[in-house]
Amino acid sequence: RLFYFYSDYDDQIGNPNFDTKELDFSYSQLFRDSRFSGNDRLDDANQTSVGITSRFINNDDGREIITLSIGQIFYLEDRRVQLESSAFEDTVSNSNIATEIQIQPSDNTWLTTSLLWNSRTDTIDEGGFGVHYQTNNSSLYNLGYRFRRDSVRTLGNTRRDLSQADASIVLPITDRWSVFGRYRYDIEEQYALDEMVGVQYDDCCWMVRLLYQQSVDDQYANELNDQIIVERDYAFVLEFQLKGLGSLGNKAESFLRESILGYEDFE
């Protein structure tokens, strides 16, 4: 697959940044038309992406047993637009080499792994793996791990690497009751990043969800003792839905879909 993307430079120095972030780089990022999430920054780009995908298919049921993907972006111009106006231009001529492997040994089991290889330093900058299992009664089990080398020097001139574990579950208790939860933990810093637990009751005509969540809102360094201070957000979400008419309360469904891989509404 070959993808060329061009976007002219627009001077955005002094423009505020409310909620835009730089997207995590992965194989799928090779073929997106923006490296930012949000609308506070407009890309400047002149680049070509090259990617190769190979699939091994089971002839009996059409299932993709193994899917292998590898690709890279070649930058034809420096990227002048950055999140912060004071940041330097990005002058590297090519991205990391992105690889992804997905294995499906059975109809309800998926194994995934991804790596980002830095060809300039001959190191693996980022990687991860995950296991996704779904039973016939709509139970979901997810387990994952992700690591990343941080190229930014922080307090004490030490390198803070990223190392995170993630687990989530959806478990029907009866035909109408189900529970769900997620726990994401920072192994490097030794604290929980996200915690979520909830319960759902689903009848023929109506449905109600209640969930509790706490997540990291901000973190900063305490210069006196070289420790990380973590500030958290806490929230209860209640949603009541009359099927075919609409819902009352926050949209918990979209949040669950983003938080739990493979989550589906029980209707």
Where are these regions (language model features)?
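Outer-membrane beta-barrel translocator/pore domains, especially the C-terminal barrels
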Residues: 1-267
